[in-house]
Each structure stands twice: as C-alpha cells, then as structure tokens.
Amino acid sequence: MRGKNKELILILIYILIFVIAFTDLRYYLGHSGLWRLLHHASVLGLTFLCVMGRITSGSLSRGFLSNYLVFFVFYELLVSALQSMFVIPMIFIDAVPWPIVFAFFYDYARINKLPDIMGRLTVLGMTGICLLSIPNILIQHRVKNGGALYATYYCFAFLPLLYMFCARRISALFTLLVILLMLLSLKRAAFIIVVGGVFLYSIVSVYVRSASRKRDRMFVLIFAGGICAAVLGVLLINRLHLNILKRLMGIFSDGGSGRTRIWRIILEHFHDSPLTQKVFGHGFHSVFYKVQTASIKRFAHNSLLETMYDYGVFGLMMVIFLMLLIIGATLMMIAMKYKYAPMMAFSLFPMGVLSVASYFFEQSYIILPICVMWGIAMGSFMGNDHADSGDAGRMQGSQQYTYTPLPAQKSEKKMEQSG
C-alpha cells in the first residue's frame, strides 16, 4: 500500500473512533434506533478499514503483538462458533474491533510517522465529546440512565491521545474540564480513574521530561497542586451538594452497587460448567445471554470475570498476558524516559479499575481510544524510534528520534527556551 493511501486510511479510522463515541453518547441519551444504527455502522466501518489496512500492508510490517491480538480475535470467534454463540452482528461490533484497532495502530506506528492533522482532529473530537457528555450527565437528575452516564467515560478515555498530540495548555484545560464532568456525573469509578490517572501521568511526565536538578521542585509543585485541587474539589462538592464523597466512602459497604452479588452468581454458574467450557469458555457474551442475574440480562461488571466465563481460563490467561505486556512496556518506557511513558502510565488506571469493576475488554467502546494510544505508543517504541538492535541501540534510538510537534507545541518550546 502506498504511503498516501495508508495515511488516508489512518485518518479515516481515527475520525471514526470519535464518530463512534459521538453516536454512542447520543444513543444512550434517548435510545434512538437511528443513533444505534449509526453507531453500529461506524464500528463495522472501522473494523473493515483496519482489516483492509492490515491485509494490504504486507507481512513484513506486522509485529508479534499485532499477530497475538489477531490470534485472540480468531480464538474468540472459534469458541463462539463452537458454542453456538456466534451472534451476528454484535460479535463483530463488541468482540472484534478493539484488538484489530490495537494491532492496526501498532503496525502503522512501527514503520510510519503519524500525520500532524491528528492533533487538530483530537482537539475537535474532544470538544465534541465533552459537549455531548453534558446532557448525559444532566439526565440523571430526571431519570435513572446508567448507560448515558457510562458513555461519558469517553471523556477520560481520550485524554491520553490529547496528551500525545496536543500542547500542554490545551491538555491542562481539557483535563480540568474532564475532572469537573466526572465529578458531576457522581460515578465513583470515573472519578477514581481521572484523579489517579492524572496524578500518575503528572509524576511520570516530570520524571521523563525534567532535568534531575528540577525534578524535586516539580514533584513538590505537583503535590502542592494536588492538595489545592482537593481543597477546591471539596468546596465545590459542598457548594453543589454533590454526594460523591459519600458514594466513595460506601464503595465497599454497598457491595459495589450490587456487583458482588452478580459476581457470586456468575462464579456459581462457572463452577457448575463442564471442564471444556471452564477451559475454553461458553462463547461470546454468554454471561449476558445465558446467566440470569436478578431475573434480567446483564454483563458481569467485571471484565476479567466476564472473559473467564465467555472464553474460559485460556482466554482469561491471554487477556492477563496482554495486560502484563502493556504494564511491562510502560515500565520500560519510564526507565528509558520515553516520550509516551506518561500516557501509558495514565492508561493503567482505566485498564485496572474498569477491568475489575466495570466493562473494558468485553466491549469495543471505552477501550477503543485507549487501544489507539497503546498501539501508537508501543508501536513507535518498538519500531521506528528504535531502529538499532540491542538495548544500547534502543536507548540511542530513543535519544535520536525527532518528533515534529504541532504549531502550539513549537511556540511553547520557544517560550520555554527564551525563559
């Protein structure tokens, strides 16, 4: 595939990632069939473009991680077919997209530079997501709509891409906006993810980007800023009469809003399953379709437990191995002070929290923008940024690699140099 065509497909896929978030936010606001149709069409179009991009790119551009992700997709499809759980089109909307997106961006970033337009697309897309999240948050004061609030998680899911492509001032502005939106949503998991993720991002960012003589001062400023933000947050909570603190304090006493009961029922069903289904699983979304919790169909609210029931212990081990690869890559980037280490560090919070208390690997929703970031960061780290062989070559490659920043980033650097 020619360079221009590959870049065009990349841009179209990146735009579709935002379109998927837009349509998802609108669908859960009023459950309109039109928005659901547009959402499904966007996801299927995204998957088709990623598959075509991978097929036409040639085998030489594919790395171990991308092949592993594709193997995981085939495993999901095979198990689902054998267990008569090959649900069309939902299996191609929920199960297939996120590994394929991860693999596509990983392979692309290994051998290609990213177009500068992705920064502008990120700002426009993030603006739209934050604006569309406002009515989803406000609706909770009139009717109970958990899906509408869950869709607002796209706000923090796109933050690592914002940090990756945009200037610090723009990133800081959107970070404050996302923290405020998640605070108003009263969603405990979202609040923990944003606060913890931003804190970890800040710490790693200082370690990676600051000289050793300035690092201690920057750490002190981060802690001081965190304390000030906490005080202002408490004042805002009291002023607006929000009960987020009460909900955080009750995160264990209320059984995770009924999650522990759901987990117990699923584990009982898993224990009663035949050995082959324990090892290889019951198939796509079997928890939703086969396990009745409280007489209604629902997911496990635990991505790892959901994966174990749907795809067995073997499938769970594959997901855990992938998580270990991501954690290992993050630690390597931090050790080598790689430019994308802070974004990878941020992503550990949504991956960890949502995997044990919500939805993550079983649905291609909130995970999609995070997979884009993982693919770009890990692909560039293992590919064109590290053309030389060996650990010494890798370190040298990371120091020699030059990144062309956006105009706003260039102006910031000039101001820092002049200061």
Task: Put a short name on every predicted segment.
Residues 213-218, 231-265, 289-291:
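Flexible juxtamembrane loops connecting transmembrane helices in multi-pass membrane enzymes
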Residues 2, 11-12, 159-238, 317, ...:
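Hydrophobic alpha-helical segments of polytopic membrane proteins
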Residues 3-7, 57, 313-352, 385, ...:
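Hydrophobic transmembrane alpha-helices and their immediate junctions
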Residues 1-77, 166-169, 381-419:
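Transmembrane signal-anchor hairpin modules in multi-pass inner-membrane enzymes, especially those
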Residues 253-311, 321:
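Long extracytoplasmic/lumenal interhelical loops at the membrane interface
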Residues 98-140, 146-207:
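Alpha-helical transmembrane segments of multi-pass inner-membrane proteins
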